Amino acid sequence: MARAKLPRSPSEGKAGPGDTPAGSAAPEEPHGLSPLLPTRGGGSVGSDVGQRLHVEDFSLDSSLSQVQVEFYVNENTFKERLKLFFIKNQRSSLRIRLFNFSLKLLTCLLYIVRVLLDNPDQGIGCWGCTKYNYTFNGSSSEFHWAPILWVERKMALWVIQVIVATISFLETMLLIYLSYKGNIWEQIFHVSFVLEMINTLPFIITVFWPPLRNLFIPVFLNCWLAKHALENMINDFHRAILRTQSAMFNQVLILFCTLLCLVFTGTCGIQHLERAGGNLNLLTSFYFCIVTFSTVGFGDVTPKIWPSQLLVVILICVTLVVLPLQFEELVYLWMERQKSGGNYSRHRARTEKHVVLCVSSLKIDLLMDFLNEFYAHPRLQDYYVVILCPSEMDVQVRRVLQIPLWSQRVIYLQGSALKDQDLMRAKMDNGEACFILSSRNEVDRTAADHQTILRAWAVKDFAPNCPLYVQILKPENKFHVKFADHVVCEEECKYAMLALNCICPATSTLITLLVHTSRGQEGQESPEQWQRMYGRCSGNEVYHIRMGDSKFFREYEGKSFTYAAFHAHKKYGVCLIGLKREENKSILLNPGPRHILAASDTCFYINITKEENSAFIFKQEEKQKRRGLAGQALYEGPSRLPVHSIIASMGTVAMDLQNTDCRPSQGGSGGGGGKLTLPTENGSGSRRPSIAPVLELADSSALLPCDLLSDQSEDEVTPSDDEGLSVVEYVKGYPPNSPYIGSSPTLCHLLPVKAPFCCLRLDKGCKHNSYEDAKAYGFKNKLIIVSAETAGNGLYNFIVPLRAYYRSRRELNPIVLLLDNKPDHHFLEAICCFPMVYYMEGSVDNLDSLLQCGIIYADNLVVVDKESTMSAEEDYMADAKTIVNVQTMFRLFPSLSITTELTHPSNMRFMQFRAKDSYSLALSKLEKQERENGSNLAFMFRLPFAAGRVFSISMLDTLLYQSFVKDYMITITRLLLGLDTTPGSGYLCAMKVTEDDLWIRTYGRLFQKLCSSSAEIPIGIYRTECHVFSSEPHDLRAQSQISVNMEDCEDTREAKGPWGTRAASGGGSTHGRHGGSADPVEHPLLRRKSLQWARKLSRKSSKQAGKAPMTTDWITQQRLSLYRRSERQELSELVKNRMKHLGLPTTGYEDVANLTASDVMNRVNLGYLQDEMNDHHQNTLSYVLINPPPDTRLEPNDIVYLIRSDPLAHVTSSSQSRKSSCSNKLSSCNPETRDETQL
């Protein structure tokens, strides 16, 4: 119903407002208002308004007050109804076309029946006329047309053909009428209409002229009409089922029907024309057509008269024109389908399992990383990977996907995740998971994130039940995809990992090896022990199991977490790192000895393989004891053990579990309290040092005498190391200004009052202070310099882990941000609350900028990959500038530890490229061999990566892929990196082993020592070794080398203060555990070991000196050495001159020529080490051992990775009692060691 305003009639205009026209009915409602209008009432004013409205706008006749309007009346006509039924309606038109197709096939079948029933020998003539016989004379070229014009047609067959022709004719005329658009001639001269008239109109004429009933009518041409009807029917069918991707199917169908119609037309045409010639039957004509179309013909069957010969020529010409066009169209569609990838069928999606990978552009490195990591898990072998990418597949990807290993399991679809049609093609709603990756090589990374966000929204809208795994680049965009099941923010993880690299060396290597799937078989065929041990330990990964179902941990139910961790490692070689309560979703790393294990707990542990795939071989205790004694007498090294023995034979370590107290040595005033102090046994040195047992239940009196909450009070009573500097007050709290939404709150060391923005500038003084260089600040710890292009929000995550509350105040290193562009106020507002954080504008390729930011006073320099150089015209050239700049810095500052981020992991080989170094060439061959063996970690033996000096964020892509099987990996990684802080969860730190700590002997005894004294869980070792390499171009087996400890090469120079040439202890928690050295007389074992190392080194040196005669090669080496020394002196003078020019003091600069073994260790990244130490080409290498076997020998300068329990874990339960007990113990605690763990 609708209302319309009608003009007033003349009578209505004359009538008064209260009058009613004659003959009109009284209105049903007052004032004639529609019931749809709101009523107005309540007072005279409302009534007057209502009447005025009625008089002006609704003064209608009561009979016309409501008007019913009908819509789409144009479709109610007879023609429109017919058009709707025959053409517009999908289902009805499909039925009509199916009927028409069947009708055409029936006419062709009736023609074949007429040919089979026809017998020319019975006579030829019109219906009702006299018949005569005709015989063809093969010797004469003349023939009669009568056998061609007249055929024999039975009466019943004629009736059926007439009826079918009449129906077809009427249908054709009706469709012509319905589809008429103003041009009748275009429809009349259409090929389909002409064929219809040829095949139907003669039959209708024979009804009115009987003699023509035997007239030949080429009914077999209806096959082409049937083909046309079939095409229309398939189109209607696809439209009815809403199938849009049907072009390929249609083209194949058209090609097949065209071939069939050509053969059928040729067969029937030649058979009929040869009635006047050789009188061929249908089968012979069909054989002739097939032979003629497929070959040049055999000549056994040939047409006899010229009309049939002419027909053959015409058919061949048509075939040569039509078929190539059809094939061209088919090939084009096939190529397009190869590009787009076709469809993933619904049947496969329901019967098979598949995951979808959505990317902006697919590169070969990204593809292989995903496939290798995804299919590394045994239970994913039956999964299919459907790649949905808007760009065309490049040549390298196409070549890889043609390999049988991947072609059977990977399907590439070209399409957009924003289109529901493409998501339907990928069957996203049936997928097991959807991985959405950002394009990190884009110049505008924010735009790349925006595309990722839209893809995630589109997938969530289309398939809300499909698990989402999203990779995001910028941390400020993370909250847009918070709904995803798993999210990895690239910049968050990158900056946090680079920060931990400065205080826990090679954290990047540790995390990378943990998140890669490996069986620990890399390097096992290498002749070098470090490669075998490093490769085997790289197979350790994080696994989980319910404690009640575990053979590893079931026996420790009701015991403390620390007790279970130690004994599981001792017995099975597994490292228990954390757990999760059944009623709590939070994962806790090392919850401490107060945590009692329950059967419902989920345990997370590090091992070569998961427990379900492990076999247990239990041996008799006597054999274990004997083997343990033999292991003490002769150390064969962990590399002698097979891979499975790490699990099967972990109970072979002899541990002295006597219940003795561990007391710090009372030697020097610096005291030993911060290291693994050697306990004394009543003054007797005959007994082997013992370690206290790990208690089943925590003893509160024996645990951490002072937690880190007392750090504030410690600082108040601790005298300053430098009397000229005042003690700066820090507070613990949460940063007040987060630079982006979604950052995890972390308790940090903060300034009591925010620093003014002017004070954050390192190289410029202000009204608050006049410092203009790092020397003037007088920092006690070495600097950490970060070189970045812009101060993005991700850089905030570099600062937070280094200022976390669990870091000791005395271990905080000053942080200098060397930025190409000036930071905005929003970023400065976020960092102004942190202590000792400064910025400076400059570039890493400018020597003046490096000197002004205090690079000569820095221990660590982090070079972050620049966004503007992440994309290059030539692949893998994006890192060229970064690599060259880092090379230059290593030449200028050899003692500096530089961590470099690269865009492409394959470029890390240039970080230590030496063309004539045989050892580097051998490592390159080893990498190629591992890659051929299918290893996911082929790059692991590159020395810069093994040492943790180079990192690429693409290495962490596997973290997202591994989360499909291990949904806890992202959470554990963020806890290790300090990005998330869960109450009660521990944190990652490091401890350095010195010669005074070697009484521990083995890693298993160290595990017990740490668990019993400070409840810390070691998870690995960072080891640095000195090697002497031969310069001869032999392989690794022929290389002459020795392995000694760094302490044998170290200069015995004393510490010269914070800016001295060599400090006794470096900055950061890495070196925070060792203090002054104890008397070597107390350690005869250490003296003997040092003498053995010295003799081995001297013997090796004397052998090489004796084998080096005065030859031309030796003279060349000497000249080269002199040349390099002069080069180093030149570089040293260059740096000093620039410092003088800038007005910087040169007293802190260390001469490049005076290299020590520590310098060599720090320069393992780049390899300018040949001929720099001595004539024996000494070099160093560093590597990470994850969860080594308990009988692994400790070496000096080993750095042990620890998971330390949260010092705030139990504060809420007994805060008052802890506060009083800590205050009572402050006087008894050594003030220099309170922040470290008492061991």
Curated annotation (Swiss-Prot):
Bias (Low complexity): 1213-1230
Keywords annotated in UniProt: Cell membrane, Glycoprotein, Ion channel, Ion transport, Membrane, Metal-binding, Phosphoprotein, Potassium, Potassium channel, Potassium transport, Sodium, Transmembrane, Transmembrane helix, Transport, Zinc
Biological-process GO terms, alphabetical: potassium ion transmembrane transport; potassium ion transport; protein homotetramerization; regulation of postsynaptic membrane potential
Principal localisation: membrane
Similarity section: Belongs to the potassium channel family. Calcium-activated (TC 1.A.1.3) subfamily. KCa4.1/KCNT1 sub-subfamily.
Purpose of the protein: Sodium-activated K(+) channel. Acts as an important mediator of neuronal membrane excitability. Contributes to the delayed outward currents. Regulates neuronal bursting in sensory neurons. Contributes to synaptic development and plasticity.
UniProt name for this protein: Potassium channel subfamily T member 1
Transmembrane segments: 94-126, 154-178, 193-208, 216-233, 247-274, 305-338
Region (Disordered): 1-45, 658-689, 1053-1081, 1212-1239
Domain RCK N-terminal: 352-488, 781-921
Extracellular side: 127-153, 209-215, 275-281, 303-304
Post-translational modification, as annotated: Phosphorylated by protein kinase C. Phosphorylation of the C-terminal domain increases channel activity.
Coiled coil: none
Cytoplasmic side of membrane: 1-93, 179-192, 234-246, 339-1239
Glycosylation sites: N133, N137
Superkingdom of source: Eukaryota
Subcellular location: Cell membrane
Entry binding sites for K(+) 3: R761, K764, N769, Y771, Y777
SUPFAM superfamilies the UniProt entry points to: Voltage-gated potassium channels
Known catalytic reactions: K(+)(in) = K(+)(out)
Assembly notes: Homotetramer; which constitutes the Na(+)-activated K(+) channel. Interacts with KCNT2; these heterodimer channels differ from the homomers in their unitary conductance, kinetic behavior, subcellular localization, and response to activation of protein kinase C. Interacts (via C-terminus) with FMR1; this interaction alters gating properties of KCNT1. Interacts with CRBN via its cytoplasmic C-terminus.
Intramembrane feature ranges: 282-302
